[in-house]
């Protein structure tokens, strides 16, 4: 009897496990998983689905997982190629029984649509109330503001463009989002400001831009760039449109501590408004053009030190975002990336 006891206990457990599997298969399951489209994290999507499906009693075999992987791979590639504001939505349902049905679909906004959604769903001010301290300091270098023309690319709600125009600078704005453009245009018209608004992608043409700007600025715009080629096009535009001695200022995320940006970080960063470039990509982008780097500052440190009293941080999310914490949720001093203010001067 003693020798047969372990076998009897094992048999009891087998029967219990079989009953539990049947119990799980009597569940009726419906669910949806929505995640940013990051193709290089394909394994994470497969693993998440595998765990969830198994937890509701529909464990996939190797063949089923391989098929799921292929479906996810194709949808991820499509979604990410269309927009860096894209999601993968995995809808699943299981009737009574062992079968689980699923669908994988891509959903996306254009960048302009994403920001228009901000207008309808978020309380203003969307980006803060004060102009960037770095931009304001450069504008203050002007001997005569009337001759110090400014081009603000991706001006948003006009946080920089409107104060610069009030200060007396002639300002041109190129804005991709129609609702943002209308906000700026309406305010400029009401105040009688010397401010022109152009609604389009800035890289479509330079025909309607001047070639004598003293300052070209992009605040919180370059993180939406998708490739080093766009960075190169920005430098080419600046070289063509700045007057000699004029300056280009923009902020972008750059690595720290020798961090090497991989595809997963680059893709997820773009989904989190945190597109990043390497120092080498920056150097390659400006190579051969009459532009020299004259300033390179931490956005966090510069803005914290130089914004008016009470204006730091500009928004509740700003300090963490410029520190890279929307991608790497670690202590700020340990983040492998940070947003930097870069200033380039046209040499000839």
Q: Which sequence ranges carry the predicted segments?
A:
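A short acidic, Gly/Pro-enriched loop at the edge of an enzyme's catalytic core
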Residues: 207-216
